[in-house]
Regions:
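NAD(P)+-binding Rossmann beta1-loop-alpha1 motif at the extreme N-terminus of oxidoreductases
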Residues: 2-53
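Nucleotide donor/acceptor-binding cores
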Residues: 6-7, 75, 148
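Rossmann-like NAD(P)(H) cofactor-binding subdomain of soluble oxidoreductases
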Residues: 34, 58-141
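Helix-loop-beta segment of a Rossmann-like dinucleotide-binding subdomain
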Residues: 97, 141-151, 204-214, 262-271
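Rossmann-fold dinucleotide-binding core
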Residues: 106-190, 196
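Active-site-proximal catalytic alpha-helix in oxidoreductases
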Residues: 184-211, 220-233, 258-261
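C-terminal substrate-binding/catalytic lobe of Rossmann-fold NAD(P)-dependent oxidoreductases
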Residues: 221-228, 233-275
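Conserved small/polar residues in nucleotide/adenosyl-binding loops
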Residues: 276-283
Length: 283
């Protein structure tokens, strides 16, 4: 059932947080963006969020803040901050978590949900995954690189009415979302793709089409990509998710064939001498 009165907070208003929040707000949901980048937040509040690319260039009116303490509890929290900032950001935002608030992370990688469960409680945390792509063009400006689906599901698996209702609500408000029975497997399938793109893209400073199609060393690149995916498969098995070698290689071939021209976030992190997502899982 679609809930037109759903109140949403997006924790982390970078490229993807602004994309998700902007799409939902554009279609009428109550959405607030939370981020520490004051210039970005001020630009959004003063001039609106400028969204370019897929769907056409337009400006969306949406609320943004650097201080979650000023907010009331919401129905759903979409987490899009850097993995390295997750624990601190969510702890600082505990006041917006109500008795029935649902939290979901669309961050890349595995392990975010366990951090969220420790802070908010296991019963409130869903899993999420997305194939959307976006980039920041400047304060208050994003570029939408794709109009592709996202998935949410109970983190331990199975069906639930709350997931079905939330997926329908997001979809009816501009963010195509599918209720997924096995969200953990879905997240691992996304991670297979990321491990084949992110590290090599960062090392060679190439976007993914140049990496696998249009460079003279593409054979070497493809062999490395396949080896990385198959090694990732072994890690997934240790986490209880068994994906066949055939499915892994089919995933890799889809990556090569998709001819995306955006660089990985890891490549941008290396270029700007920022911490990559990997730092969040160091011990």
């Amino acid at each position: 059932m679609v809930n037109k009165n759903l109140k949403v907070a997006v924790l982390g208003a970078g490229a993807m947080g602004c994309l998700f929040g902007g799409l939902l707000a554009e279609k009428g949901l109550s959405v607030v963006l939370i981020d520490v980048w004051k210039d970005h937040v001020d630009e959004i509040n003063n001039k609106g969020l400028k969204m370019m690319g897929h769907g056409g260039d337009r400006t969306v009116k949406i609320k943004a803040t650097t201080d979650p303490k000023t907010l009331q509890p919401v129905d759903a929290i979409i987490i899009m901050c850097k993995a390295t900032a997750l624990e601190k950001a969510l702890t600082n935002s505990k006041n917006i978590i109500g008795d029935k608030t649902m939290l979901m992370s669309f961050q890349n990688g595995i392990g975010h949900e366990e951090i969220m469960q420790n802070i908010a409680g296991k019963d409130k945390v869903l899993g999420g995954s997305t194939t959307q792509a976006s980039s920041i063009q400047g304060p208050g400006i994003i570029q939408n690189h794709a109009s592709l689906p996202s998935w949410i599901g109970e983190y331990d698996g199975g069906h639930s009415q709350r997931v079905k209702d939330l997926a329908e609500t997001f979809t009816s408000h501009g963010l195509e979302t599918i209720a997924e029975e096995d969200i953990k497997r879905r997240k691992w399938m996304k991670l297979f793709a990321l491990t084949a793109i992110g590290p090599l893209s960062a090392i060679f400073d190439l976007h993914h089409t140049d990496l696998y199609i249009s460079n003279k060393n593409q054979k070497m690149s493809r062999n490395l990509g396949k080896e990385i995916i198959l090694e990732t498969r072994e890690v997934a098995k240790a986490d209880g998710v068994d994906v066949s070698e055939k499915d892994c290689l089919e995933m890799f071939n889809r990556i090569v064939d998709s001819r995306q021209t955006n660089k990985s976030s890891m490549a941008f992190d290396v270029l700007t001498v920022s911490y990559t997502h990997l730092r969040a899982h160091e011990t």
